[in-house]
From Swiss-Prot:
InterPro entries associated with the record: G_ERA_dom, GTP-bd, GTPase_Era-like, KH_dom-like_a/b, KH_dom_type_2, KH_sf_prok-type, P-loop_NTPase, Small_GTP-bd
Gene transcribed to yield this protein: era
Family: Belongs to the TRAFAC class TrmE-Era-EngA-EngB-Septin-like GTPase superfamily. Era GTPase family.
Stretches the record annotates as G5: 154-156
Annotated stretches, region: G3: 62-65
Annotated protein name in UniProt: GTPase Era
Bilayer disposition of the protein: Peripheral membrane protein
Subcellular location: Cytoplasm; Cell inner membrane
Residue ranges, annotated region (G2): 41-45
Stored CDD domains: Era, KH-II_Era
Length: 301
């Protein structure tokens, strides 16, 4: 009886903030793992998404966007997380946006040139490029920057050519035993995923109003006698004015955030969820490395 060969490897998804890395990861996995929002810097942890298909297991590392800006402790730690992801993988997917090329893209490229892993260039949001005639010269410019394994124009939002990326990934997975059972889609705990869902809703419903000085701590996550979960989430902000913003007029904003977060949690955990949210002012947390460690920002560096 012949034993079927299995293939397994780690793939880093890298790029400057807000180019669509999290959306691409979610499409590759077929469901939502990494939070997506139109604000830059929404991914703060290295989330591992796992996709197993027959003998192939691809383990995706969703990095925070690499930044030139390193003034705040949180930005320094996010850059460290992103850079460390690049060093220990079989393959890198470098995501750029349409015909835009910025100093941040250049910085990511320089880090990739120093690395050993082959790089797929995913040119995202090509469906949004107004001047289609600009696309080909831009792709030629990108091709001249380094020796990419492949250059794939994609739309992570619609899923266009995402299967092409997945196919290239499968071809480059080394022969190895699978790291995770086939039904795993992430190595993160439910508690962690609950905090990410709440944070996504904060980003979505507060938009540009709220600065990045907001995070979520899950104070309680227990199963109840109804077979569901009781979850208490604490939203930390830096100033009293931000607290009022999160709560909204007569509590309307936090109520909406809670309702939408609960829906996503119930879908993800496949069980009823009772969710309660509080807002607390904890000034200076984004500048304090000790506070960031206690909130889990450096647990995987």
């Amino acid at each position: 009886m012949s034993i079927e060969k299995t293939y397994c490897g780690f793939i880093a998804i890298v790029g400057r903030p807000n180019v669509g890395k999290s959306t691409l990861l979610n499409k590759l996995l077929g469901q939502k793992i990494s939070i997506t929002s139109r604000k830059a810097q929404t991914t703060r942890h290295r989330i591992v998404g796992i996709h197993t298909e027959g003998p192939y297991q691809a383990i995706y590392v969703d990095t925070p966007g690499l930044h030139i800006e390193e003034k705040r402790a949180i930005n320094r730690l996010m850059n460290k997380a992103a850079s460390s992801s690049i060093g220990d993988v079989e393959l890198v997917i470098f995501v750029v946006e349409g015909t835009r090329w910025t100093p941040d893209d250049e910085m990511v490229l320089n880090k990739l040139r120093d690395g050993k892993a082959p790089v797929i260039l995913a040119v995202n949001k090509v469906d949004n490029v107004q001047e289609k005639a600009d696309l080909l010269p831009h792709l030629q410019f990108l091709a001249s920057q380094m020796s990419f394994l492949d250059i794939v124009p994609i739309s992570a939002e619609t899923g266009m050519n995402v299967d092409t990326i997945a196919s290239i990934v499968r071809k480059h997975l080394p022969e190895a035993t699978h790291h995770f059972p086939e039904d795993y889609i992430t190595d993160r705990s439910q508690r962690f995923m609950a905090s990410e869902i709440i944070r996504e809703k904060l980003m979505r419903f507060l938009g540009a109003e709220l600065p990045y000085s907001v995070t979520v701590e899950i104070e309680r996550f227990v199963t109840n006698e109804r077979g569901g979960y009781d979850i208490n989430g604490l939203i930390l902000v830096e100033r009293e004015g931000q607290k009022k913003m999160v709560i909204g007029n007569k509590g309307a904003k936090i109520k909406t955030i809670g309702i939408e977060a609960r829906k996503d949690m119930q879908e993800m955990f496949e069980a009823p969820v009772h969710l309660e949210l509080w807002v607390k002012v904890k000034s200076g947390w984004a500048d304090d490395e000790r506070a960031l460690r206690s909130l889990g920002y450096v647990d995987d560096l």
